[in-house]
């Protein structure tokens, strides 16, 4: 006997798609202390940003690195990040822990990154001694409270 189901399933491909990408974002933004100790804070930060769709420019380099193969290899203190650029990147507040230990970061450009919130801006205080410029463009989750953190930079 054949039974035909007349009810629609509650399964939505769109919901599954979002859950899948949210799960990846959690993994991609996770701070790995052991990895930072192995390769140094600058390379670990560069790997995080590239993995999430951002790019970095190293001190005394003219171009941005936006792919793993363009991140320079070498001693952990040899290549220092000078500029971060994230446009439509999937970076989250948790990933901003990668800023810890960056001593030469001068500029941060964040644009249309939907998952950046006020606490992300608060974590920028880790680089306040070297930071000269921060550009925040079209960040929907940043409120006046988040902007207030900039006063401390």
Where do the model's predicted regions map?
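LRR N-terminal entry segment and analogous cap-like coil->beta motifs
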Residues: 21-37, 43-127, 132, 136-137
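Short, intrinsically disordered, charge-balanced linker/junction segments flanking boundaries
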Residues: 147-153
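Leucine-rich repeat domain C-terminal region
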Residues: 13-14, 131-132, 140
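N-terminal mitochondrial targeting presequence
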Residues: 1-32
């Amino acid at each position: 006997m054949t039974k035909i189901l007349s009810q629609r399933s509650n399964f939505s491909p769109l919901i599954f798609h979002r859950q899948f990408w949210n799960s990846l974002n959690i993994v991609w933004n996770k701070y790995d202390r052991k990895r930072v100790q192995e390769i140094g804070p600058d390379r670990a930060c560069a790997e995080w940003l590239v993995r999430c769709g951002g790019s970095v420019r190293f001190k005394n380099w003219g171009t941005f690195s936006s792919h793993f193969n363009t991140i320079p290899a070498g001693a952990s203190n040899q290549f220092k990040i000078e500029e971060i650029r994230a446009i439509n990147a999937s970076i989250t507040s948790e990933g901003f822990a990668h800023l810890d230990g960056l001593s030469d970061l001068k500029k941060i450009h964040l644009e249309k990154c939907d998952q950046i919130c006020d606490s992300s801006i608060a974590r920028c205080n880790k680089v306040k001694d070297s930071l000269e410029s921060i550009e925040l463009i079209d960040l929907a989750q940043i409120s006046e409270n988040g902007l207030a953190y900039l006063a401390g930079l």
